[in-house]
Amino acid sequence: MESNLSGLVPAAGLVPALPPAVTLGLTAAYTTLYALLFFSVYAQLWLVLLYGHKRLSYQTVFLALCLLWAALRTTLFSFYFRDTPRANRLGPLPFWLLYCCPVCLQFFTLTLMNLYFAQVVFKAKVKRRPEMSRGLLAVRGAFVGASLLFLLVNVLCAVLSHRRRAQPWALLLVRVLVSDSLFVICALSLAACLCLVARRAPSTSIYLEAKGTSVCQAAAMGGAMVLLYASRACYNLTALALAPQSRLDTFDYDWYNVSDQADLVNDLGNKGYLVFGLILFVWELLPTTLLVGFFRVHRPPQDLSTSHILNGQVFASRSYFFDRAGHCEDEGCSWEHSRGESTRCQDQAATTTVSTPPHRRDPPPSPTEYPGPSPPHPRPLCQVCLPLLAQDPGGRGYPLLWPAPCCSCHSELVPSP
């Protein structure tokens, strides 16, 4: 029984169960894939600084988690060029960082996606129902608690397994039940959030369009993540239920230790290392690569015609998918576009003392001035009303209206006579 359970704890002398030439090629391929993802995410973080995006946001936290995950996986596979015995005799902290921490990081990225889409849904509701803000705080607390529970279980199981202070079967059972159950729950909650986003498309699509995507694309990406994470968890739970306690080496495809797969030579022949790499590719590298590509950093638009004027300030439509989900909801504004000719913004904080300034327009040209059938510059059709208030320096208490440029015809708004 001890030989069958040897895969649960790193054992000295275990090597990938493939010929050296094949093992070297697979190791080089695995290392190259993870290294490419690492440099891709690293470049995305530099683009955040280059384009002047918000430095601390959902997007940057997500990219930082993916960067750390790719770095740990690249370091792990680099051991298998020449230092396989050394990789199997690591201390508790390096062992946990290389073998267990990447799984925790993937779970954190899944909870981060849940948090963002839940925020999109709640921000769409909070304008009409302010009490929904308490529900958002409860959702955030639940996902933070799930992340801490996942981290605590994996750390304790790794430490106890390394020191052999508990039965391997009991540790494996607890770790798989807790970790994979949390994966399934978070995958289902992500599916529910995406359904709510799709159902409330008129009020939630603005957040997704600010990133350059659509509700359909976000739903497709979220559905793929749900299938990948849920299938991984269901496979592990099913395999654990079917595996007897004396034959754990037929299971343990749970990304816990590369040497576990080297112990599968009796069941898989010389394909243990290959199977392990394929499992990592399907259930780790593929979903992370899709997420990084979907949430990549975009260049802000340079065309000022896409800007909006809100309360006398110009805001370009370069909102970031992870920065402020409720930006437009908080400002309380709505945009109306009529055949590309005018942009209209109504200020929701108007007071009873505010009067709408008239638009100073040039007098219409006389027929003798423009002999043609129509004047070369027709009269502007401006629908923007932007009262800019200031305190009367004379102390009379009357608001003053300062001149402001019009966003559609570039003329001037002047106070009433």
Curated annotation (Swiss-Prot):
Sequence ranges of Pro residues compositional bias: 364-375
Membrane topology: Multi-pass membrane protein
UniProt keyword Membrane, yes or no: yes
Lumenal side: 1-31, 82-89, 162-175, 242-274
Location in or out of the cell: Lysosome membrane
Transmembrane segments annotated in the record for this chain: 32-52, 61-81, 90-110, 141-161, 176-196, 219-241, 275-295
Region annotation Disordered: where it falls in the sequence: 344-375
Superkingdom as given in the UniProt entry: Eukaryota
InterPro entries: GPR137
Record topological domains on the Cytoplasmic side: 53-60, 111-140, 197-218, 296-417
Bias kind Polar residues: ranges: 345-354
One GO cellular component term: lysosomal membrane
Glycan-carrying positions: 4, 257
Protein name: Integral membrane protein GPR137
Species, as recorded: Homo sapiens (Human)
Taxon lineage: Eukaryota, Metazoa, Chordata, Craniata, Vertebrata
